[in-house]
Amino acid sequence: MTRSEKVEIIAKLEEGFKASEAIVVCNYRGLSTKKLEELRNNARENNVKVQIVKNTLANIALNNSGKTGLVLKDTNIYLWGEDQLSVSKVAAKFEENNDKFEIKTAHIEGEVADVAKIKALAKMPSRNELLAMLLQVWNAPITNFTIGLNALKNKKESE
């Protein structure tokens, strides 16, 4: 890999890391190409970026984007995106289904996060799920009132 290619990779990573709310670092050693494609497809569906990069290049991009404190060792795959829940969910779900995939660490909301925090975030409902729950709570009294009125109407009609 030439120096200009390395500079280009660092610039792209730096741009992506700056715009991201979450960066998750995972071990992918032993995963087949088919499984990596599955991860990439799942990530793409959730607007999450996935890339395998040398640690030295990733470290430079992380430091340049202000995301410091991550200890990078061994082989790593990086997942990042603007929505920290999506990134956490993609990583946690894939780890759950694949023994050889392991979440190592993350940088979320300006601080280094451990595996427990990533898994806790993955269990939280997404924004759309929260909105659906809220609408359901708001609609419950109206729905119950309507059911009561219909029951009263049916009772009056049967008399």
UniProtKB/Swiss-Prot annotation:
Keywords: Ribonucleoprotein, Ribosomal protein, RNA-binding, rRNA-binding. GO terms for molecular function: large ribosomal subunit rRNA binding; structural constituent of ribosome. PROSITE patterns: RIBOSOMAL_L10. Signal peptide: none annotated. GO terms for biological process: translation. Coiled coil: none annotated. GO terms for cellular component: large ribosomal subunit. It comes from the Bacteria. Disulfide bonds: none annotated. Pfam families: Ribosomal_L10. Part of the ribosomal stalk of the 50S ribosomal subunit. The N-terminus interacts with L11 and the large rRNA to form the base of the stalk. The C-terminus forms an elongated spine to which L12 dimers bind in a sequential fashion forming a multimeric L10(L12)X complex. Belongs to the universal ribosomal protein uL10 family. HAMAP family: Ribosomal_uL10. Forms part of the ribosomal stalk, playing a central role in the interaction of the ribosome with GTP-bound translation factors. NCBIfam families: PRK00099.1-1 (NF000955). This is Large ribosomal subunit protein uL10. It comes from Campylobacter jejuni subsp. doylei (strain ATCC BAA-1458 / RM4099 / 269.97).
